[in-house]
């Protein structure tokens, strides 16, 4: 059986096995993110990370304010946006969220007694964000974000701050459930991606 004869389910399985490692999914179908099970896996990980920090006070403080994307969505305005504008907002939000989680990871590593369950979920979030970035790049989100039709009218990314890992993971979870899911749904529906 040649590479080109490989069934689609095998590509999906191989791709999903590569995702937790944060490795680029080379040779995978470019629309893998369009499979709802893929995004649901990341949503589940984000929700687990948020849940692990419930009631956690001592180990869950970031000891500084970290800037994260505001995850509120005005659905009326979102539906009226061009896909390119949506891509800009998602791409900028994903980049800022990745920076925030990496900063949280650095703070946790430098703490005197990092809490292992928290460290595990932070590491998973870093890996997940890298994989999502790769999947969005394969979908063409980066290309759309660089050259939307009316880039001059793009509003600056709204931000908030997180001072605990719970809030950081809540933003992560909400971003995936909100803007990322809305964007990928629209981008996957259109046939020219």
UniProtKB/Swiss-Prot annotation:
Changing residue 114 to L: In ECYT5; uncertain significance. GO terms for biological process: acute-phase response; blood circulation; cell surface receptor signaling pathway via STAT; cellular hyperosmotic response; embryo implantation; erythrocyte differentiation; erythrocyte maturation; erythropoietin-mediated signaling pathway. Disulfide bonds join 34-188, 56-60. It holds the Pfam family EPO_TPO. One of its GO terms (molecular function) is hormone activity. Produced by kidney or liver of adult mammals and by liver of fetal or neonatal mammals. Keywords: Congenital erythrocytosis, Disease variant, Disulfide bond, Erythrocyte maturation, Glycoprotein, Hormone, Pharmaceutical, Secreted, Signal. It comes from the Eukaryota. Residues 1-27 form the signal peptide. Glycans are attached at residues 51, 65, 110, 153. It is linked to Microvascular complications of diabetes 2: Pathological conditions that develop in numerous tissues and organs as a consequence of diabetes mellitus. They include diabetic retinopathy, diabetic nephropathy leading to end-stage renal disease, and diabetic neuropathy. Diabetic retinopathy remains the major cause of new-onset blindness among diabetic adults. It is characterized by vascular permeability and increased tissue ischemia and angiogenesis. Belongs to the EPO/TPO family. This is Erythropoietin. It comes from Homo sapiens.
């Amino acid at each position: 059986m040649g590479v080109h004869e490989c069934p689609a389910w095998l590509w999906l399985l191989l791709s999903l096995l590569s995702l937790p490692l944060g490795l680029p999914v080379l040779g995978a179908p470019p629309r893998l993110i369009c499979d709802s099970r893929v995004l649901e896996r990341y949503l589940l990980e984000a929700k687990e990370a948020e849940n692990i920090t419930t009631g956690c006070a001592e180990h869950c403080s970031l000891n500084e304010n970290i800037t994260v994307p505001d995850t509120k969505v005005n659905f009326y305005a979102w539906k009226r946006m061009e896909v390119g504008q949506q891509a800009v907002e998602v791409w900028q939000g994903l980049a800022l969220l990745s920076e925030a989680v990496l900063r949280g990871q650095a703070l946790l590593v430098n703490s005197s007694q990092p809490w292992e369950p928290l460290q595990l979920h932070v590491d998973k979030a870093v890996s997940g964000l890298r994989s999502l970035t790769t999947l969005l790049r394969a979908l063409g989100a980066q290309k759309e974000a660089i050259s939307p039709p009316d880039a001059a009218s793009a509003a600056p990314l709204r931000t908030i701050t997180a001072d605990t890992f719970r809030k950081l993971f809540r933003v992560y979870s909400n971003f995936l459930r909100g803007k990322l899911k809305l964007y990928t749904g629209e981008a996957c529906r259109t046939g020219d991606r």
